[in-house]
């Protein structure tokens, strides 16, 4: 049987891609879907459970040609095609192409150093304007999508689940006993320079004599960058005030870690770390975001309490760690941790684009 939907999952993301594969196979018609995954470990684990998971080590235009019979809906989870490859897609393929946007897809810097590069990127954007649909897990990306690709392409909202939902989180929280009274400050969620760790360290230096711990999540990203920021933080605050996470954690371990966090700082303007922020918001942590960023505007629009990164270093430590509102609105985060809501979003998407 030829599947109705082929999913191209180039990013080795055992959490978000893996959970979506599980969600679709267990709540929808599995025979309608084929999943091409780029991660070998994820393939080995998932293929033991599901027959529709295929390992694909190379993702490029020829990969689409390899699997496309002319009938399937081609769903790209994070854009792996280059601007040149997008320009080479035939109209009949564009009309069956669905792009599920990941944060870096929209906001990574593109090379426009020459007129030729600019024209190529412009043509690629026009091509995307003709595809079957764009899917945004973060609904506030829609403005950027419309700005770049026009108003004609249909845009739908479907959220990538983490595999843990409201009831699961609540259960972990109920059974977790915090024993460390120090103020725990989480800076970023990975080892990427856009998180501006060094800038944040300089702002936090004012509080280095306070009873605090800085948590650095460095399990993925740029290894050289990770080494550098650990060195910088060690010099500035001392190793005894650092909690550095180099290894991947289970979601149970990660949520327990978040239970210990008091303050989370994410200083960037584009969309990223959305799943992390949803969990932190639901758990009632004090979140600092860039006041010029899309994440800050989104949470403010949803009436969820967030604070400006510009205040860090200007206010007292007591002000830094104390929330203005004790009973904050967690409805936004709660809706995105609702399993039935997420299933409904994806079911509706497949019914609409199929």
Question: Where are these predicted regions, by residue range?
Answer:
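Donor nucleotide-sugar binding/catalytic pocket of nucleotide-sugar-dependent glycosyltransferases
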Residues: 129-180
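A charged, aromatic-enriched C-terminal amphipathic alpha-helix characteristic of glycosyltransferases
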Residues: 316-354
């Amino acid at each position: 049987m030829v599947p109705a939907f082929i999913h191209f999952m180039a990013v080795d993301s055992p959490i978000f891609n893996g959970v979506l594969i599980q969600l679709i196979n267990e709540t929808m018609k599995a025979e309608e879907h084929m999943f091409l995954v780029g991660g070998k470990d994820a393939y080995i684990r998932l293929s033991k459970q599901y027959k529709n998971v295929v390992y694909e080590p190379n993702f490029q235009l020829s990969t689409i040609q390899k699997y496309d019979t002319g009938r399937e809906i081609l769903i790209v989870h994070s854009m792996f095609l280059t601007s040149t490859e997008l320009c080479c897609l035939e109209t009949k393929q564009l009309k069956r192409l669905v792009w599920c946007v990941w944060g870096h897809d929209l906001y990574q810097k593109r090379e426009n150093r020459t007129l030729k590069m600019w024209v190529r990127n412009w043509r690629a954007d026009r091509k995307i304007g003709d595809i079957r649909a764009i899917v945004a897990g973060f609904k506030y990306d829609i403005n950027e999508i419309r700005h770049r690709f026009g108003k004609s392409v249909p845009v739908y909202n479907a959220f990538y689940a983490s595999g843990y939902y409201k009831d699961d989180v609540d259960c972990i929280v109920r059974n977790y006993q915090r024993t460390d009274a120090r103020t725990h400050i989480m800076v970023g969620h990975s080892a990427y320079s856009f998180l501006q760790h060094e800038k944040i360290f300089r702002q936090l230096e004012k509080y280095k004599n306070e009873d605090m711990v800085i948590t650095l999540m460095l399990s993925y990203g740029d290894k050289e960058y990770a080494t550098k920021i650990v060195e910088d933080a060690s010099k500035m605050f001392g190793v005894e005030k650092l909690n550095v996470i180099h290894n991947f954690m289970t979601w149970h371990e990660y949520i327990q870690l978040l239970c210990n966090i008091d303050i989370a700082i994410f200083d960037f303007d584009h969309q990223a770390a959305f799943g992390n922020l949803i969990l932190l918001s639901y758990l009632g942590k004090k979140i600092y975001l860039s006041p010029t960023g899309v994440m800050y505007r989104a949470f403010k629009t949803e009436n969820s309490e967030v604070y400006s990164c510009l205040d860090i270093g200007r206010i007292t430590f007591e002000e830094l760690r104390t929330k203005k509102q004790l009973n904050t609105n967690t409805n936004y985060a709660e809706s995105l941790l609702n399993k039935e809501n997420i299933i409904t979003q994806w079911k509706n998407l497949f019914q609409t684009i199929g």
